[in-house]
């Protein structure tokens, strides 16, 4: 008894549908579907059975534009415009503000202003601004990651399958008679055949050539067409080990000049190709390319299958099922392609010539007719047998119907469970993909932060170099100031010695001055008693002329001294301004040192914050990976024993990774503790140094206070010397204060050097952290690979749970995996290009910095040369100043000698005066006259000697005036702010010598007056003595001769 659709009962229909013998899983499912098609069209089993064919067709159509989309790449701007509303990765809304190329990475980029502050910048990257926006709202991304609509749940392959199922259900509900039934059954049978062919003989499938990377890697041969890095195609020219790196490498000759060599690396040639066409890559990064038209046998099989399907479409409705079974029997053991291969082979089949198509159709019809005749004979035998068992069959029909209904209910229940299981697995897959995307975003953020830290590291290095240069300049200035302070201290000691000598000289001069004043008073008293000399006397005129000359010389000297004092005051003011400038520079250097301390402290705090941030990120990554692995474990708990074993391996791997992370964290914590201990020791050492410096400063202050007290207790007679000493002490105190400040600055500079060295150590630790982060990133990539493997295995579980949906899901997963792999490869290529650009920029910056350092070194050398020349000039001027001071000392010695001569003359004059008074008292009249004559002659001789002495003194005075003028001229030309105390001392000495000269001239004038008075007395006494005896005259003459002899 046949069904209304022409099918036989389920018990025997499958026996003739496959002549291969034991049916495969695909054939069994086809028999079930064939038996189920006889039921109602709206039953759930019929919907589920007819769904995959339409889903497979839909997937084949949807997969056609995939390669075109992959060829576009991330650099394709599309039709986006500035100001357009977009979504980044489907989740972050914003507005496009920039489209085009950038300097931080090659290719096309899109700058987007996000609605929320979840970005990375404010429109500027690497110091170059591309657009304006608030902070943390700007982001740069590839145009391929922009969409005009937000991403929705359940998109992708699931949506395609659901839409195909819905369309198939609608077509089933709206179908009519046998021709629509034929249109429904043929695609179903074709998909079942494809599934059975794939499960029976996987080696003939095209998916096995390009879907499994690991199998393709092992089958690489010379001459194969391959894909390198997801973007570069070429031909294999070398496979094996190399000298430049360990492991298996593949040498590829590219189609375009995008390579790096000509087949030779480091002097060793592996193959021959044009320059820039050769490329070496690890084997796991090379994918062999397979095309459907490369194998003639496969093409022939495809043509046969296409002819069979076209013949089925033209066969009558009554024999459609048997023709499907005949096609299955002829193709059951042959490999077939699904999806794109079936559609491509059907297109090729249409282009076959008419004669060949008709011959093959005729052969297929003959085989069909023979098979139908055999089936008719078998059916007749079965009907004969069935007539004898009609009663038994009628009794069993009700039981079979009940069993069939029960089987249908159980099948629907199982199918519902399978659907729920597939839905849960899909949801978990979406969650895992979201977690993976989130991890990728985190890794991108970390990479961007690492790049920013590298930029800030370069800025810090340049800043440290500048600070080192400043520290060197400060040290040089400190050395110069120390040398100047030592020289001033030596000058102060010399000044003290000179002040002691001057003090003794002043005491001697005061004693001599007191003696001379007494003698002058006596002489004045005698002159007043003797009366004034006549006005027409030549000696009086000479004395007046000498007095006028002396007054003019004193006025001229006063004028010169005022000019010299003005110049000295001017030089003192300039020196004071220079001291103020030095103080201002010192304060500036102190401020710079404080700023450097603050910067170093800030850098240390930032480094500590970065270390804590890296630790927290590593902990979060470890926890996220643990969660993802636990989720995978929960999803795969219901799998077979092999999957449980793999989950255990994954768990052991995760435990090993956790142990590695814990060890890294322990190492980082130990480093941190060690650094804190070192910081504490450095702080204690700096505190001790500061305390020692404070104690030394207190001792210096006490020492200088004691010296000031001693100098304040000096007598009032040395007021000028005290003023000079006080000025010198003030200057020395200022210099010592500057010395103390410079010592503090030197200590601060040492502290800054230590801090800079610590910062460099911390930068090295930071680089080690970066390396650890890179290792953790590699571990994350390994975990992602494991995750991808787990996803593939999950897909295998899905295929086991639902064999009907396995091909569609697997093809979708493969296409998504290909796209994902291409995106990751392109992202890695972009990152590599970005790193290359960053390396080039850093090298250019290093060259610029080296040029600046060389220029600064040249400037420093020229400055040192200038300083040496100035020091030589200064030494020469100091030598000339010392020579002038020696000459002044010699002049002062001559003055002392002159004063001694004057004293000797005055003493001889006093002796003569005493002798004259005694002679006047004791001698009587004529003898007194004779003695007076004798004394008159003696006085004339002594007067002549005194005139000669006065003339010699005048000549010496003129010579001293000339020397004084010359020394003043030299002093005007060689004056220096550092020799100000010596200049003051010489000025005071010059004034004192001028006073001594004035006193000597006054004494000479008084002596001349006294001589004139004695001459007048002798003239008056000459008139009194008119006569005298010859003996008396002869005796005085003899006495005079004897005196002359003596």
UniProtKB/Swiss-Prot annotation:
Brain-specific, expressed in the hippocampus, inferior olive, and piriform cortex and in the cerebellum (at protein level). The modification Phosphoserine is found at residues 50, 203, 208, 212, 315, 923, 973, 979. It comes from the Eukaryota. SUPFAM superfamilies: Cap-Gly domain (SSF74924), Myosin rod fragments (SSF90257). It is found in: Cytoplasm; Cytoplasm, Cytoskeleton. Residues 26-39, 315-339 have a biased composition (Low complexity). Interacts with CLASP1 and CLASP2. Binds preferentially to tyrosinated microtubules, and only marginally to detyrosinated microtubules. This is CAP-Gly domain-containing linker protein 2. The gene is Clip2.
